[in-house]
Amino acid sequence: MSRATPFSAVINGLTPFFASRQVICGSGRVGIGQSGDEAGFQLSQRADYIEVEVGLETTLKRGIINTRDEPHADADKYRRLHVIIGDANLAEMSTYLKVGTTALVLDLIEAGVHLTDLQLARPVTAVHHISHDPTLRATVALADGRELTGLALQRIYLDRVDKFMSAEGNDDPRVADLLEKWAMVLDLLERDPMECAHLLDWPAKLRLLEGFRNREGLNWSAPRLHLVDLQYSDVRLDKGLYNRLVARGSMERLVSEQAVLDAVDTPPTDTRAYFRGECLRKFGADIAAASWDSVIFDLGGDSLVRIPTLEPLRGSKAHVGKLLESVETAKELVDELTN
């Protein structure tokens, strides 16, 4: 994100958002507390491991906002926003809204929209409190004394993003789709979280667990429930419970399986990933290394040649497509780029 944005604005704007977005993108967890010894089900796998509001660490004293700043881009222009509070998701709607709504909120913050009125009185406690209540009725205290649910906080963010995009005249269909799905999911969650069991991870997992508990006559302290919890996320097609739900049409997908397979080897065309991917495809034998911020060529000389890719939105097909089509060898490409 832009380094010109004050980091205090990032903290103020994102802390309540991250604390509340787990109602949408939590992946569900059996057990309460870091050790999981207390019986119960909660929204998020990571919530109980968040211990401070802001911090650098990722394996202890984890923060809602992480300060690790390695942008893998032009450090004078860009700051890295290292998000460690989010769960890993399998449900496509959870992932779509997790990433998409965060991007929209960042647009607000970078534009200077003030969100200080949403500051939480006790942010870390709020993260835990929201996660521990799958009924979504738990309220958390704001610094100004108001008490709001996680759903209510998400609705405020949705409303402000919607108004901002309208004021800016933003007619991007991707933004419109995100806003529509964000609102739809919040409506369903407010009516009955189980109405999202075909869309989001934590309701899908909870539905499976409740069915298993009822069939086997188990309470939430039963060790077998932890096994079901883990098996939900098993990525093996024949073992993972999520994959079984997909196979029988019980989870709504947003992309086709073919689109997923295509994305394994076909980079997006509108970022530097296009340049990196096409270089690997055409000149893989001549590339010593490739990363976010450079492609390093080995042309057989005394030294390697590093081509920096410090601008995330340069190196797109529009920017370098014709150049890549016009050259036959890696040396020709490097000569064109360096001369």
Curated annotation (Swiss-Prot):
Q: Which InterPro entries match?
A: Pup_deamidase, Pup_ligase/deamidase
Its BP terms in the Gene Ontology are:
modification-dependent protein catabolic process; proteasomal protein catabolic process; protein pupylation
A Gene Ontology MF term for this entry? peptidase activity
Tell me which Pfam families the record gives: Pup_ligase
State the family named in the UniProt similarity comment for this chain: Belongs to the Pup ligase/Pup deamidase family. Pup deamidase subfamily.
NCBIfam families under this entry?
depupylase_Dop
- Supply the name of the protein: Pup deamidase homolog
Q: Which organism is it from?
A: Rhodococcus erythropolis
* Top-level taxonomy: Bacteria, Bacillati, Actinomycetota, Actinomycetes, Mycobacteriales
